[in-house]
Curated annotation (Swiss-Prot):
A motif ('HIGH' region) lies at residues 15-25. It catalyses: tRNA(Met) + L-methionine + ATP = L-methionyl-tRNA(Met) + AMP + diphosphate. Its EC number is 6.1.1.10. This is Methionine--tRNA ligase.
Length: 677
């Protein structure tokens, strides 16, 4: 029976847009997708959304290293991420970016409401500054020893060992990740969110019983140690949204990142021309359900800051957080050197998506436990469960139905009571899917698969097929096997979308949860084709080797204009205004005796002549070709005495040097002596 339809909004944590999706990411997205697909099968209205987390200094610096703009980098990463998720059949309704108009507007709205309600405080702080790079260091670009648990090599905003959050200035023996230098202290005005004002509300939310026990217990520890005001601003240079009425100050990435859930949903509503659903889902008294699937490393932000921000800006809070653990491979942390740090795209070159979806699902529960991807066990389990128990059930019976009965199933069930046992299991299996006890659901389904295969073994259709006058028995036995297979695949449909499509094509019928009580009787199925292939350890070995090769390729140095010559330290407008750039006509150009690099240029500034030595000879072997051409020069550079004479300025050129030097020229119409601004 179809349940009362609910309105549900589901999100996954936003992948950071500076790297590829790997198997650690995929645990969460598979877990959420299985749950979402089950909810859709039960008739609920589900909106499943995600986005790239696209702001912060790490993105700014990596784009600089790659020689591209941050916008270009996050655009490329978004396409890569979406391709990976589509490859794993993650059924998002919308995938957006935090670097969007929707997210900017919502971030400014929430900030403004918090400020108007008195929850934003200003104060001057002492901040770590990299004296070598000339920039304030964001949290993730300082490493040191955690001030709480004393674990070494921890980032400046939170400890990955004990989960504590703190200020970078609290780190013991901090070092700049950018240069390795020891940071110095500098003062800067920052904006703070008054988290302690929400302590009572957050404790009540914790005690509501909705959160996982492990999450609630951890939150209680944080309450007992006392909540602190949260620094939500960062200084330029920074890639993100500038804070309204605060030039040079930007929203910290963790302020606008969770707002990205709202921004992605707003974008989806706008695409649909839906003007009501956004408010319906996000208003303070909304009766829609909101669930965030997240990893245990970001519980602090989602269980404290996020609900407090929503409460303070008059939006609804999450219905629940569904928190999972980490992924290990072969019992250890994923390793690039061992080839177990595996990208999603690499996996799909060696295995199908359903195989990993099944293995993760079989190991997941509602607890925050780490999941180990044991690659040998993975091969054994996929072959034993999907191939031997489930798909084999169909192949053992379909051949007889196709060949002997033209694909038509029997008019009656051979064993109605056995069939009822299978359909009665829907309640237990459905509850397991609902409560995210995925491993339990798989165990229940595989136990039924064992029963179904025992039935076929006992009935032995291959023996019956050879006995005269038993065609009706043969049809009934095989039809029973196929109907049991159909029920099993209906239960597995949230997990195995690709296999389910093939099964639906064979059965000539959709796998519908609410239709399992009605078996397929006198129903024509299509010709059976192989549904799933066995896998082996040779594929695993190839996967691991490919991952190692990718690491080697990624280690190759990045080249490009910005990578080879990084942008210099930011200067003020007043500094720039001191440089006097002028259009100059090249009146004469000649070689310099005794130099294989220099040309002597005579420049006309429209009433004043200048003598300039320029190191452009390698790119302009015929100096006469430059005569009559206009260029741009620094006119107020102090004269420089050289052994060939005095150079009275500098002409502007681009390129890395050698033969790749390109003299700059103004557009037609510019006149000698005109200022370049």
């Amino acid at each position: 029976m179809t349940q009362v339809a609910k309105k549900i909004l589901v999100t996954c944590a936003l992948p950071y847009a500076n790297g590829s999706i790997h198997l650690g990411h995929m645990l969460e997205h598979i877990q959420a997708d299985v749950w979402v697909r089950y909810q859709r099968m039960r008739g609920h209205e589900v909106n499943f959304i995600c986005a790239d987390d696209a702001h912060g200094t790490p993105i700014m610096l990596k784009a600089q290293q790659l020689g591209i703009t941050p916008e270009q980098m996050i655009g490329e990463m978004s396409q890569e991420h979406q391709t990976d998720f589509a490859g794993f059949n993650i059924s998002y309704d919308n995938y957006h970016s935090t670097h969007s108009d929707e997210n900017r507007e919502l971030s400014e709205l929430i900030y403004t409401r918090l400020k108007e309600n008195g929850f934003i405080k200003n104060r001057t702080i002492s901040q770590l500054y990299d004296p070598e790079k000339g920039m304030f260091l964001p949290d993730r670009f300082v490493k040191g020893t955690c001030p709480k648990c004393k674990s070494a090599d921890q980032y400046g905003d939170n400890c990955e060992v004990c989960g504590a959050t703190y200020s970078p200035t609290e780190l013991i023996e901090p070092k700049s990740v950018v240069s390795g230098a020891t940071p110095v202290m500098r003062d800067s005005e920052h904006f703070f969110f008054d988290l302690p004002s929400f302590s009572e509300m957050l404790q009540a939310w914790t005690r509501s019983g909705a959160l996982q026990e492990q999450v609630a217990n951890k939150m209680q520890e944080w309450f007992e140690s006392g909540l602190q005001q949260w620094d939500i601003s960062r200084d330029a240079p920074y890639f993100g949204f500038e804070i309204p009425n605060a030039p040079g100050k930007y929203f910290y990435v963790w302020l606008d990142a969770p707002i990205g859930y709202m921004g992605s949903f707003k974008n989806l509503c706008d695409k649909r021309g839906d003007t009501t659903s956004f408010d319906e889902y996000w208003k303070k008294d909304s009766d829609a359900e909101l669930y965030h699937f997240i990893g245990k490393d970001i519980v602090y932000f989602h269980s404290l800051f996020w609900p407090a921000m929503l409460e303070g800006s008059h939006f609804r809070k999450p219905t629940n957080l569904f928190v999972h653990g980490y992924v290990t491979v072969n019992g250890a942390k994923m390793s690039k050197s061992r080839g177990t740090f595996i990208k999603a795209s690499t996996w799909l070159k060696h295995f199908d998506a359903d195989s990993l979806r099944y293995y993760y699902t079989a190991k997941l529960s509602s607890r925050i436990d780490d999941i180990d991807l044991n690659l040998e066990d993975f091969v054994q389990r996929v072959n034993a469960d999907i191939v031997n128990k489930v798909v084999n059930l169909a192949s053992r019976n379909a051949g007889f139905i196709n060949k002997r009965f033209d694909g038509v199933l029997a008019a009656e069930l051979a064993d109605p009571q056995l069939y009822k046992t299978f359909t009665d299991a829907a309640a237990v299996i459905g509850e397991a899917w609902e409560s995210r006890e995925f491993g339990k659901a798989i165990r229940e389904i595989m136990a039924l698969a064992d029963v179904a295969n025992r039935y076929v073994d006992e009935q032995a259709p291959w023996v019956v097929a050879k006995q005269e006058g038993r065609d009706a028995d043969l049809q009934a036995i095989c039809s029973m096997g196929i109907n049991l297979f159909r029920v099993l695949m209906t239960y597995l449909k949230p997990v195995l979308p690709t296999l389910s499509e093939r099964v639906e094509a064979f059965l000539n019928s959709e796998l519908n949860w609410d239709a399992i009580e009605q078996p397929l009787l006198s129903h024509k199925v299509n010709t059976f084709k192989a549904l799933y292939n066995r896998i082996d350890m040779k594929q695993v070995e190839a996967l691991v080797e490919a991952s190692k090769e990718e690491v080697k390729a990624a280690a190759a140095p990045v080249t490009g204009p910005l990578a080879d010559f990084p942008i210099q330290e930011t200067i003020t407008f007043d500094d720039f205004a001191k440089i006097d750039l002028r259009v100059a006509l090249i009146e004469n150009a000649e070689f310099v005796e005794g130099s294989d690099k220099l040309l002597r240029l005579t420049l006309d500034l429209g009433g004043e002549k200048r003598n300039v030595f320029s190191g452009i000879r390698s790119s302009y072997p015929d100096p006469q070709a430059l005569i009559g051409r206009q260029t741009v020069m620094v006119a107020n550079l102090a004269p420089r005495k050289m052994r060939f004479g005095v150079s009275e300025g500098m002409v502007m050129a681009a390129g890395p040097g050698g033969k790749d030097i390109f003299l700059l020229s103004p557009d037609d119409g510019a006149k000698p002596g005109q200022q370049v601004k």
